[in-house]
């Protein structure tokens, strides 16, 4: 590979890197303490509708067997 091609590839790679860094720098950031407080608040507000915390009523559970086994 010639040095001209290598330098062209290097410049293209550097431009992609700069573009990616500019994109990342423009992202709005919040402090971890605020993000965790918001997450805790969201979890507490939606806890009643969370089936993993409250469970699924047996009448609404589509995976529960409708009838028992005759052998048992």
Curated annotation (Swiss-Prot):
SUPFAM superfamilies: Transducin (heterotrimeric G protein), gamma chain. The modification Phosphotyrosine is found at residue 42. Residues 70-72 form a propeptide. Keywords: Acetylation, Cell membrane, Lipoprotein, Membrane, Methylation, Phosphoprotein, Prenylation, Transducer. The modification Cysteine methyl ester is found at residue 69. The modification Phosphoserine is found at residues 10, 26, 49. Guanine nucleotide-binding proteins (G proteins) are involved as a modulator or transducer in various transmembrane signaling systems. The beta and gamma chains are required for the GTPase activity, for replacement of GDP by GTP, and for G protein-effector interaction. This is Guanine nucleotide-binding protein G(I)/G(S)/G(O) subunit gamma-12. The lineage of its organism: Eukaryota, Metazoa, Chordata, Craniata, Vertebrata. The gene is Gng12.
